[in-house]
């Protein structure tokens, strides 16, 4: 729907991702307390089914199905500035061809490391803060605040993505994340408060890039196939979090030390990000570039 406005589009849609993180656990607790374990979870399941049916009836895969054009542009702009050639649903890609493409592996590594670090940080945040003297309730509350602040991060980095491109947005995100974790490692109360706010923004931003980076590199043509290859590869990198986490704790002997390992991974990810061409196979941007040259 939004091939050239994906930054802002992802900025808005991933707000829901962060709201879900902030409110789902309290919602489950409230439902169980009110209706009991079985009934409470059953009502949530029914709500999810109803939401799915509403989505099935109202959501369309392509804007043309609603008489519209991508990015809400006019027909004239679409025909002039967007690629509309070819009827191949896969955009000329095959699974084997994608697996042989360097950019596919770069996308999987970049986003996988982002998510690896985010999963590691968030899974340890409560334990880390209780270890610094916060009560269990206060530490849990800080995690909820972190998720809510992520709503701001989603929009902020979505706007940065839209303005400067996904590559520069990711590099800024990685630098921001490094500073946030470094501040947390000061082991001070003020440092915790500042880092929770900064980590919240980073967590919100991280969700944006899961779609934005591969969509920017490969474009909308054949993206369903691209995503079906990219996502499992990214998940494999993400799931090494548990091995990395355990090794970091064993080597450093503390959660603080593990955070320094995460900072190192983020720095490595900056170097990987510098290697990627963010629009290499994007046919819409290719048309736009030709217009600028011609």
Predicted regions and their residues:
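A membrane-interface helix-boundary motif in multi-pass transporters
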Residues: 33-46, 247-266
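C-terminal transmembrane helical hairpin of 12-TM major facilitator-type secondary transporters
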Residues: 144-157, 161-213
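A late C-terminal transmembrane helix in Major Facilitator Superfamily
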Residues: 21, 217-252
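Extracytoplasmic gate region of multi-pass secondary transporters
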Residues: 93-157, 241
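Helix-loop-helix hairpin linking two adjacent transmembrane segments in secondary transporters
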Residues: 17-66
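C-terminal membrane-cytosol helix-exit motif in multi-pass small-molecule transporters
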Residues: 46-82, 272-277
């Amino acid at each position: 729907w939004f091939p050239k406005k994906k930054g802002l589009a992802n900025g808005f849609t991933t707000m829901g991702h962060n709201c879900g993180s902030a409110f789902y656990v309290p919602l489950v607790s409230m439902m169980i307390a009110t209706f009991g374990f079985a009934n409470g979870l059953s009502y949530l399941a029914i709500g999810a089914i109803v939401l799915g049916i509403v989505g099935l009836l109202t959501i369309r895969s392509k804007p043309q199905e609603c008489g519209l054009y991508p990015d809400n542009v006019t027909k004239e702009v679409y025909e002039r500035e967007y690629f509309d050639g070819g009827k191949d649903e896969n955009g000329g890609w095959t699974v084997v061809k994608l697996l042989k493409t360097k950019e596919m592996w770069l996308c999987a590594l970049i986003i996988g490391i982002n998510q690896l670090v985010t999963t590691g940080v968030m899974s340890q945040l409560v334990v880390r803060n209780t270890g610094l003297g916060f009560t269990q309730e206060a530490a849990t509350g800080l995690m909820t605040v972190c998720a809510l602040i992520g709503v701001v991060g989603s929009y902020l980095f979505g706007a940065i993505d839209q303005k400067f491109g996904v590559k520069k947005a990711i590099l800024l995100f990685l630098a921001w994340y490094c500073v946030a974790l470094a501040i947390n490692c000061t082991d001070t109360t003020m440092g915790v408060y500042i880092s929770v706010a900064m980590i919240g923004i980073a967590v919100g931003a991280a969700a944006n890039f899961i779609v934005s980076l591969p969509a920017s590199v490969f474009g909308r043509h054949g993206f369903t196939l691209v995503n079906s290859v990219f996502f499992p590869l990214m998940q494999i990198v993400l799931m090494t979090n548990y091995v990395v986490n355990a090794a970091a704790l064993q080597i450093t002997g503390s959660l603080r030390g593990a955070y320094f390992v995460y900072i190192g991974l983020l720095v490595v990810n900056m170097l990987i990000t510098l290697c990627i061409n963010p629009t290499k196979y994007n046919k819409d941007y290719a048309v736009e570039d030709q217009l600028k040259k011609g």
